[in-house]
Structure formats: structure tokens, C-alpha cells
Amino acid sequence: MTNALLAPWTTAFALPPFDLIRDEDFAPAFEAGLAEARAAIAAIADNPAPATFANTIDALELAEATLDRVAGVFFNIAGSDSTPAREALQRDLAPKLSAFSSEITNNRALFGRIEALWQARDALSLTDEQQRVLMLY
């Protein structure tokens, strides 16, 4: 059976297909989302091309798309309809998500790319929105 969390959502307004999502879908979906995000972030950090807004910041904005989608569904469901199984998964996920966040924060190569953009920001002709997003990184 297909994991509804990892399949494209064809529902109205691209809402999660709640009728197809099962509790046992969450753990593998989180693992897939973490693996995808780690690979995307490694590709950004290890990119030999000079840092640009597109190949660094825009890419970072998309790097965690699957993970964000899975987490959004899970934490909304777990927060509104808690069960022992969902609480157990939250306990299992907490250190994994924390470690992932720390990996990003402590990634020197990634920081170097963001710092290069920050130092060159006045010469980059960024839109107001891009300037704000860069500042947030």
C-alpha cells in the first residue's frame, strides 16, 4: 500500500488525504523526509559553484518540503487527537528532529555559503522579500 503522506495529494485545495493516512505511515514518512532533507542540504552545502540566492537560500527553502509536510500533518493530528501510539512516536521523533536541526545549525559549509551571501547582500539586487529571507537565515 502506498504511503499517503509521501504520495502527491490530489484532494481539493491540496489538503492531506486524511481518509488514507494511517498511524503506521508516519514513522517511515518522517524517515523519508529526513533522508531527503539531509541529501538536499548536503547538496547545497557541498555545491562547488559560488553561492547565489537561488542555489543556496531558495534551495534551502525547498530542502525540507517533504519533512515539513509530514510534520505538519502529524503534529496537527497528534495535538488534536492524541493516542498512546502517537505520543510514543512524538517521544521517538523528538531527539531525531533535534539532531537534524543541530546538523543544519552546525554545518560550517552551509553557514559559509549563507555568510557569503550576507556579506554581499548589498550587491545582489535582492527584492525586499529576498532580503528578509536572507536575514532570517
Spans of model-derived segments:
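Zn2+-dependent metallopeptidase catalytic domains
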Residues: M1-Y137
